[in-house]
Amino acid sequence: MGTAFKKFCIKFCCCCCCEDEDEEEKAPLIGHDTLDYFDREAKKRRDQETNLWSEPGDPSHSERDDDRVLYKLLQCRQQTQPGSRGYRRLSIDIEAMRDVRREVRDKWKMILENLGFMAEAESLLNVSASASYDRMRNAASARSLLQTLHTETSLFNSKEPPPERYLFILDRLIYLDAAEDFVAKARRFYPPKDDDEEEESNPLGINLPLLLSRMNQNISGGEDEDEDESEPDD
């Protein structure tokens, strides 16, 4: 619509053709509901990438002890005064748990790249919150291989059940006919260790009962933490 015609309509017409066109031009191409959906999905992806939940399909993060502890630590930190001593302690515990999970993931990535999946390793290791056991092609075989990796290698912390997220990755490797090769490489690169060797080589090992105890102390002593905030750190 030309500028002169717009001026004519504004001056002499009672219709709202100009305003309607302007409104149409300003109308968003994507609705708010769609934008909210994309935002939620992006947050879920960031949450999975940051925390590497052992049970990715559990939105409550309560089915496994390690997920439950990490989730409670995150919730407790949200309710703690930023910058306080309690907040810093919680942040250290949270990062310690994340570091252990990242270490396991890095081991898997190294083996995948050694098998030739240089470009595909990240995609193979990505497990979304929508992961479903019903969609797995070889669930029984994948679980058997996961147990083998748990008992016959040092990929995981042998004192805890192996993270379920790697069940989905093994299912993909079975489909690609690379699962047996992966297990063979894992046996070679990460042979099993006894308890003493594991403690020496894994300084980031997580004591879940101790973390829970410290977290409960932080909750019950929240007022004291605010007072301690004014004291100089040692």
Curated annotation (Swiss-Prot):
Subcellular location: Apical cell membrane; Melanosome membrane; Lysosome membrane; Cytoplasmic vesicle membrane
InterPro entries from the UniProt entry: Melanoregulin (IPR031638)
GO molecular function: phosphatidylinositol binding
One Pfam family named in its UniProt record: MREG
Region (Disordered): 215-234
Function of the molecule: Probably functions as a cargo-recognition protein that couples cytoplasmic vesicles to the transport machinery. Contributes to retrograde melanosome transport from the cell periphery to the center. Overexpression causes accumulation of late endosomes and/or lysosomes at the microtubule organising center (MTOC) at the center of the cell. Probably binds cholesterol and requires the presence of cholesterol in membranes to function in microtubule-mediated retrograde organelle transport.
GO BP field: melanosome localization; melanosome transport; phagosome maturation
Name under which the protein is recorded: Melanoregulin
A single GO cellular-component term on record: apical plasma membrane
Compositionally biased intervals (Acidic residues): 222-234
Keyword Membrane: yes
Protein keywords: Cell membrane, Cytoplasmic vesicle, Lipid-binding, Lipoprotein, Lysosome, Membrane, Transport
Transport recorded as keyword: yes
UniProt membrane topology term: Peripheral membrane protein; Lipid-anchor
Organism: Danio rerio
Family to which the UniProt record says this protein belongs: Belongs to the melanoregulin family.
